[in-house]
């Protein structure tokens, strides 16, 4: 570029000199003597020679390469104007939800487990292959001789919500929660695809809650820190259902969706049949009071409900009865690193405990309902070894007073399980766990079966 500029400048000066000489010399041609003419001719010849030389050099010089176009990245990296707003913080729909903050959280969890049943096989469609179901432990079958392995990510959870601050300062809260224990859209052969399942969907304002969530008869604060989906399943209330709940301080009262499960007279077909009636006219009623402190918490709860069955046609049945149950539960802190969690239940527990291990009532020969009562509970110890390591040991049980003359001998009588786990947290929000369980299921006639399971898991919370 510099050489090209010099050549152009020299050429311009040369041409200017030639023209100036020609112009200045023209008026004096007639008067000029021979010497001056010769001098001018010599200068012109010299200038012509110089011009030819410069033109030759210009033609011989290589053409410079065109300047490269600016890279897209450089353009993208150019600083924005001072008044420009970043796209990611600009409101797409201004004032669409004033005073509202949104919630998106949950976790991804993958489980792998070896299950060894003493009296038969857990079939592929059995939910007991995904998590511990006390009523799913085989009884009276033949031992396969080797454990079965299963892996899935069905417990993965998604939680959505919105919190809106109203004009008066009150907060309106909504929550939606899903996991993937729904009906299979695929299978283990190809896609391992499973449908999302609605766990919670409720609206909360001041002291009121309306929607689907944990039953008020349940104390979710004392659930075990388990690798399994539930943990102390034999001895805990585990029910989510639609309800209207009122809470004032430590006291809460609710009306909840009713349902009745019955055992037919002498157990019906197969000796352990279940009838789901959906005939109740009144909601289930619950009440709870909870005391809290630095020491932990203690809670007492009661449940009252109508059990009802109606049929039409020949041998029609129309009967109902009331039943009740009670619960004591709590968590006691033993210093900074340990706590004890427990629950004790008694009365007509039915569908509320052990994933409906026993039914609410049994039909007699005349079609009347007779309630089935029992006791259940668990105790768990949790110890934190360090910020990265923690351990849980727990025992759970349930036992029922069946009227064997009505139920027959093939209905569930009792179950219990012993479990221990260890959790490792190598990174924030990342948990790796292992848990072993030994479980026993017994029928009313005394037959029993056992289940041993080793479960491994990886869980990332977000």
Sequence positions of predicted segments:
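Sequence/structural signature of outer-membrane beta-barrel proteins
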Residues: 115, 181-186, 215-219, 224-230, ...
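Outer membrane beta-barrel
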Residues: 89-130, 134-264, 279-297, 331-335, ...
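Outer-membrane beta-barrel "beta-signal"
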Residues: 424, 449-462
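Detector for outer-membrane/organellar transmembrane beta-barrel domains
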Residues: 293-412, 416
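N-terminal periplasmic/intermembrane-space "pro-region" immediately following the signal or transit peptide
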Residues: 31-123, 141
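Gram-negative bacterial Sec-dependent N-terminal signal peptides
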Residues: 2-31
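C-terminal closing repeat unit and adjoining cap/tail of repeat-based domains
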Residues: 418-435
């Amino acid at each position: 570029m510099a050489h090209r500029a010099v050549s152009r400048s020299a050429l311009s000066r040369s041409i200017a000199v030639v023209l100036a000489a020609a112009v200045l010399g023209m008026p004096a041609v007639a008067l000029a003597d021979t010497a001056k003419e010769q001098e001018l001719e010599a200068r012109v010849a010299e200038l012509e020679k110089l011009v030819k030389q410069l033109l030759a050099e210009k033609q011989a010089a290589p053409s410079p390469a065109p300047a490269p176009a600016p890279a897209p990245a450089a353009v993208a990296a150019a600083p924005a104007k001072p008044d420009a707003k970043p796209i990611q913080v600009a409101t797409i729909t201004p004032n669409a939800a004033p005073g509202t903050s949104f919630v998106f959280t949950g976790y991804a969890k993958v489980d792998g487990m070896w299950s060894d049943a003493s009296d038969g096989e857990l079939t592929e469609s059995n939910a007991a292959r995904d998590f511990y179901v006390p009523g799913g432990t085989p009884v009276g079958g033949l031992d396969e001789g080797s454990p079965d392995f299963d892996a899935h990510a069905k417990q993965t959870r998604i939680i959505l919500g919105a919190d809106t601050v109203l004009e008066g300062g009150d907060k309106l809260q909504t929550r939606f929660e899903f996991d993937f224990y729904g009906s299979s859209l695929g299978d283990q052969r190809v896609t391992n695809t499973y449908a999302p399942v609605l766990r919670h969907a409720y609206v909360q304002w001041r002291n009121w809650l309306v929607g689907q969530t944990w039953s008020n008869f349940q104390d979710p604060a004392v659930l075990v820190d388990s690798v399994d989906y539930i943990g102390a399943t034999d001895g805990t209330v585990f029910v989510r259902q639609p309800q209207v709940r009122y809470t004032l301080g430590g006291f809460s009262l609710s009306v909840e969706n009713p349902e009745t499960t019955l055992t037919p007279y002498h157990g019906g077909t197969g000796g352990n049949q279940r009838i789901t009636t959906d005939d109740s006219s009144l909601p289930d009623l619950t009440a709870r009071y909870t005391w809290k402190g630095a020491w932990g918490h203690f809670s007492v709860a009661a449940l009252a409900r109508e059990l009802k069955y109606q049929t039409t046609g020949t041998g029609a049945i129309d009967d109902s009865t009331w039943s009740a149950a009670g619960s004591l539960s709590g968590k006691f802190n033993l210093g900074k690193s340990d706590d004890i969690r427990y629950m004790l239940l008694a009365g007509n527990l039915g569908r509320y405990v052990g994933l409906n291990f026993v039914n609410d009532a049994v039909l007699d020969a005349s079609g009347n309902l007779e309630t089935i009562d029992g006791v259940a509970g668990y105790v768990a110890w949790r110890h934190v070894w360090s910020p990265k390591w923690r351990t849980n040991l727990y025992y759970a049980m349930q036992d029922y007073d069946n009227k064997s003359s009505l139920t027959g001998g093939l209905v569930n009588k009792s179950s219990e399980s012993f479990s221990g786990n260890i959790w490792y947290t190598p990174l924030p929000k990342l948990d790796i766990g292992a848990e072993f369980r030994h479980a026993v299921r017994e029928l009313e006639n005394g037959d029993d079966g056992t289940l041993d399971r080793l479960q491994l898991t990886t869980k990332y919370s977000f």
